[in-house]
Amino acid sequence: MSIEGKDLKFPAYVWEAPVRLWHWTMALAMIVLWGTGYFIGAPMPSVPGEASENYLMGYIRFAHFAAGYVFALAFLFRIYWAIVGNKHAREIFLVPLSMLDPTWWRGFFRVVSHYCFIRPKNDWHLGHNQLAMAAMFGMYVLGTVFMIVTGFALYGEGTLMGSWANTMFTSWVIPLIGDSQLVHTWHHLCAWYLFWFTIVHLYFVIREDITSGLTVVSSMISGWRDVKN
């Protein structure tokens, strides 16, 4: 494949079914986590009555914990599929190695110049372009790892000493960061960080689908990338 994408063959099967399933599972989990996390951080006023009859915040916390498990397990599965799947499945995890290749950087700056409206047309790519790879690794992958680690550290506070979450995460994450409140704060800030990253991600995906001449959005549904008629 040339850096301009002239040697690509279409249609091409890019996103395997497990990658597509992971993508939409993570999207749904993140929506639940953002929604429930917002109310955990800014809970509604208390209501009168028996706690057993007014358990709304309890249900919200349970939904947050359940979605957190789905989020973490889906990410672990994604790492596994990066090992056994096709080359596009591991693009977002190999960015530090890709950066050692000078041609990768040439492609990176070509993509950046397109998004800055300096170049009218972007190069065609089967999977992620270089900027997307860097963003997915530096923002999504690292951000997700941070959210999982801090999330289970906070979860382990409630499950108390002796639980797997407390032993594997709480016991070292909270002392490392400083205290429980700081972990809450950084977990909260990273949630907003991932939220705005997702908004920008949606903008670029939709923009690329409109301007590139390739099927971008639909490829994450069908798995196939093709030239639009």
Question: Model-flagged regions — what are they?
Answer:
Residues 1-229:
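Membrane-embedded alpha-helical bundles that constitute the cytochrome b-like, heme-associated redox core
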